Regions:
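Conserved PLP-enzyme active-site core in the AAT-like
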Residues: 6, 10, 38, 55, ...
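A glycine-/small-polar-enriched, mobile loop at the entrance of the PLP active site in fold-type I
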Residues: 2-57, 61
């Protein structure tokens, strides 16, 4: 077996690969419903949330788009310190949002004080944060950044991309007051791609 040394897709356990060879379960059956609901309940523990966890047929980038399209009408502050946070900013622009950037040098974190200063200058409906910027390997201090938003601009929603961190590091979604958090299956979960997951407390 050839091993992949990438952030994702990552190596999938042979037992999981074998399970994919089994016949599919029709999605309208009681068996599927029981399995799907059971998966959601388990994911709530991973997300550390009491809210619903959605399992949509989309990519992580698709869930970035879902976040900005559904949770902000106009004004978004995008924190940018790498390729994937840059992508989320561009997704917001492409979806007709008035997105402003809070930039940090690639390889550096988004500083809580810088976020506080930006939030004091303008009222934003949402702020986008990539928890672990996959392109550089930098983990942003999400707990501290969320605390800044709650203190300085409590009506601003916190949207988090945790594609390469959820399941690999502790994220206390409810306790930290994160409003929307997304991840994908092909990184820390070590599953096949194309199974994004997200938790929404505001729809």
């Amino acid at each position: 077996m050839t091993h992949m040394f990438t952030p994702g897709p990552v190596d999938v356990d042979p037992e999981v690969l074998e399970a994919q060879a089994k016949p599919m379960i029709p999605h309208r059956t009681a068996e599927f419903n029981e399995f799907f609901r059971g998966t959601e309940a388990k994911l709530q523990k991973v997300f550390m949330t009491e809210n619903r966890v959605f399992q949509p047929p989309a990519t992580g980038s698709g869930m970035q788009e879902a976040g900005v399209r559904n949770l902000a009408q106009k004004d978004i502050l995008s924190t940018v310190n790498g390729a994937f946070s840059q992508r989320w900013y561009q997704v917001a622009i492409d979806n007709g949002k008035q997105a402003d950037r809070l930039d940090a040098t690639w390889g550096d974190i988004i500083e809580p004080d810088a976020l506080a200063d930006a939030l004091k200058k303008k009222n934003y409906e949402a702020v986008t944060i990539v928890h672990n910027e996959t392109s550089t390997g930098v983990e942003n201090p999400l707990k501290e950044l969320a605390a800044v938003v709650h203190e300085v601009s409590p009506d601003t929603l916190i949207l988090v991309d945790a594609v390469s961190s959820l399941g690999g590091t502790k994220i206390e979604t409810d306790a930290w007051g994160v409003d929307f958090i997304l991840t994908s299956s092909q990184k820390c979960f070590a599953m096949p791609p194309a199974c994004p997951l997200d938790r929404k407390s505001v729809v």
